[in-house]
């Protein structure tokens, strides 16, 4: 895939994270920009005694030139847009982002399944304060037992919690709408077993590190799932 589309190794193409942060940009431009920043910052971040003043000046100048050259070429940051929109107007009906790019689907490993997220702020039921962030996620194609239940809903949950933290709000409800919902033939027995489990453990609680100030600074260790009780695993085969 990467060779065919002349993309960096490991790239998924025009999908999810890339589309969220660099909507409309060319991947090659973004990758060249990132590699240039890494090169120049390597010199700038080194201790003074390991980098000559000339090298440091060269790196600073190169950094400025790269930023100027790529100004306006790195696409539209949809995540910043949603956060800034809700910060300015919590009642906005335009706080949405999308992963769906019909013009670049042929250059994605898989066209985005969870396609659009809409964020709605509602009042707190107790105080009446407008500070509860809800999310409505639309999914164009739903592998229900595997994709939706074990990945897509978690993604929407994490987005809701992280954006709420940026806005000083509380996470509220998550709504999911799906089209083309399906169960693959090689998942029917496993799904039947899953549905037979009528008594589920209590729901766990997701806690985020309150010291993280920027949504871009979260790391794996900043998420804590409390009270998770796992039932015996069910092995699903990946449908190809």
Model regions: which residues?
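Terminal, non-catalytic protein-protein interaction segments that mediate quaternary/complex assembly
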Residues: 1-240
